[in-house]
């Protein structure tokens, strides 16, 4: 009787397969926790880096502005005129249709990625691009955007070209995946590269989908007349910023 009772009290052995399964599950859980922790630390480090970059850019922009003011004051004090450096960046907006226009004009508008009315793009200014703008000047409004305009356009209307699709830039991770190899990992990097026309301007600008702007508040005056004659077409220099405000 005692032998039977002892047999009843014995705990059945756990099968080896179950032990292995439990061990594998525990190891997998540890790996997942480690990966989750590593990702959390990476996000934290990236947020800190983005914050530091934004702070650095703000300081750089402020320094650029102060230098311009100082140079203008020095020139005025010496009785001279201060001539700012030639603009390196333009923002171009298509304002007219192209029915009946020459193939050359049509081709240039395609090269500028202005396929629809009220599309806008950034353009790096050089001899070749200025000649292109002159060819299509009756069909575009363009000028020199300030930092505020570049910032607001990208933050409010910025879409990226990701896998040939138009994707809203709602997360810095989208920018990092596409432009991280060029050192551009966040919105502030993208804005800085465009505004300063940096070494990777071409890659940054091609990543940005052409901006789809709204019809300007108050409407257009005369699309077929040049800006200097009271119309809308052509180079309006710094006044492009007012038009951007009306269309953004």
Swiss-Prot record:
In this chain the sequence repeats are located at 7-18, 19-30, 31-42, 43-54
Q: Which residues carry this modification: Phosphotyrosine?
A: 139
**PROSITE patterns according to UniProt:** RIBOSOMAL_L30
Gene Ontology terms describing biological process: cytoplasmic translation; maturation of LSU-rRNA from tricistronic rRNA transcript (SSU-rRNA, 5.8S rRNA, LSU-rRNA); ribosomal large subunit biogenesis; rRNA processing; translation
Disulfide bridge partners, by residue number: none
> Which positions carry N-acetylmethionine?
1
Q: Name one GO cellular component term.
A: membrane
Can you name one GO molecular function term for this protein?
A: mRNA binding
Major location, coarse class?
cytoplasm
Modification sites for N6-acetyllysine: 124
- NCBIfam families per UniProt: uL30_euk
Its name, as the record gives it, is Large ribosomal subunit protein uL30
Q: Which gene encodes it?
A: RPL7
């Amino acid at each position: 009787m005692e032998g039977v009772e002892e047999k009843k009290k014995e705990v059945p052995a756990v099968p080896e397969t179950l032990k292995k399964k439990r061990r594998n599950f525990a190891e997998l859980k540890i790996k997942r926790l480690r990966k989750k922790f590593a990702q959390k630390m990476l996000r934290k480090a990236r947020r800190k880096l983005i914050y530091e970059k934004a702070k650095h850019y703000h300081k750089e922009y402020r320094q650029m502005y102060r230098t311009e003011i100082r140079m203008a004051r020095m020139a005025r004090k010496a009785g001279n005129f201060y001539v700012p450096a030639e603009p390196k960046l333009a923002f171009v907006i298509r304002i007219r249709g192209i029915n009946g226009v020459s193939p050359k004009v049509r081709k240039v508008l395609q090269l500028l990625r202005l396929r629809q009315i009220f599309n806008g793009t950034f353009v790096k200014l050089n001899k070749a691009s200025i000649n292109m703008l002159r060819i299509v000047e009756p069909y575009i409004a363009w000028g020199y955007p300030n930092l505020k305009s570049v910032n607001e356009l990208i933050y409010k209307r910025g879409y990226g070209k990701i896998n040939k699709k138009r994707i809203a830039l709602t997360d810095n991770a989208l920018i990092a995946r596409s432009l991280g190899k060029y050192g551009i990992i966040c919105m502030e990097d993208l804005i800085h590269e465009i505004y300063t026309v940096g070494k990777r301007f071409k890659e940054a600008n091609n990543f940005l989908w052409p901006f789809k702007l709204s019809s300007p508040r108050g409407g257009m005056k005369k699309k077929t007349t040049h800006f200097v004659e009271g119309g809308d077409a052509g180079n309006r220099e710094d006044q492009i910023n007012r038009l951007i405000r009306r269309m953004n």
